[in-house]
Each structure stands twice: as C-alpha cells, then as structure tokens.
Amino acid sequence: MTTTLKIDFVSDVSCPWCIIGLKALEQAADRLQGEVALDLHFQPFELNPQMGPEGQDIGEHLQEKYGATPEQSQKNREAIAARGAALGFTFSMDKRSRIYNTFDAHRLLHWAEEKGVQPALKEALFTAYFTDGQDPSNHEVLVRCLLYTSPSPRDATLS
C-alpha cells in the first residue's frame, strides 16, 4: 500500500540550497517508489524581500548579508555546484552574477498551483536562474518558464 506524504516545501527560487533539497527529496521518493507518493506544494519564502528591481551583485550581497569573504563565497559555490551535480542539477555559477527580487515569481507559482503545473514551473524557474543565469524577476523570463509548463501564458497576469 502506498502512503501519500503531503509536503509543504517552503523555498525561494533564488536559494541554491532549496533546489538541492528538492532534488534530494525527489531522489528519496524515487527510491521509495510504490511505498511513498509525494503530494508536494511549494510555499513562498522571499530570501530578499527588500531587494530592488535592479537586483544586486551576488558577491556584494553575500558579503553584506552573511559576512562572507570572496574566498568563502567561492568555496561555497564549489560545494553547491558539486552537490547539485551529484543530484543531477547543473549550477552554472559563471552565468549568475546577480541576485534578484522574486516576488513576481512567487505570484506566478501561486497561480501555477491552481492550474496544476506548480512543480514544473518551480523546476523551470530554478533552471532559468541557476543553470541559464536568467533574471527571475524579469517578466519575459517568467513567461518563458510558464511556456515550459504548457498552459497559455494569457491565463496568467502579473499586473
């Protein structure tokens, strides 16, 4: 008999540890296939709700918020990339130089849950930011991620 686990996954699309946690959770569920099924719901958490629309240089941000030196930041990026690779997710650290406000991405994820496409959109947003180096606050990026999930983008409004 399969047990269904309802999981509220609180995360931000600009958090590398969130995609690492999600991939690890998915792998664990795959290992327990037939025994456990996930009923996964993403809940919003903005890491940087006060972030301006222009974003901020990621090195500056990490130094200001966490006191990280450039050497510490580099070592952390290497650890994140290695952990992501082990879980089948590609971090392209050289493509990602800024951190952005993710409020509109969370708004779109809320809409996507109502349409039944939230997991695919969440994955597309993580990939857009961490693999492709795209700005998750840019509405064109959000529409491209939405198109990945197949519904008509005319159904979602970000105004």
Sequence positions of predicted segments:
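Extreme N-terminus of proteins, especially the signal/transit-peptide cleavage junction
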Residues: M1-L5, Q33
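Short active-site neighborhood of thiol/selenol oxidoreductases, capturing the structured segment around
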Residues: T4-S14
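Conserved redox-active cysteine motifs that mediate thiol-disulfide chemistry
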Residues: V13-K23
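Structural alpha/beta surface segment adjacent to cysteine/selenocysteine redox centers
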Residues: L22-Y129
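Conserved acidic, metal-coordinating active-site core of Asp-based
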Residues: K115-S150
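Single conserved hydrophobic/aromatic residue that forms the stacking wall/gate
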Residues: Y148-S159
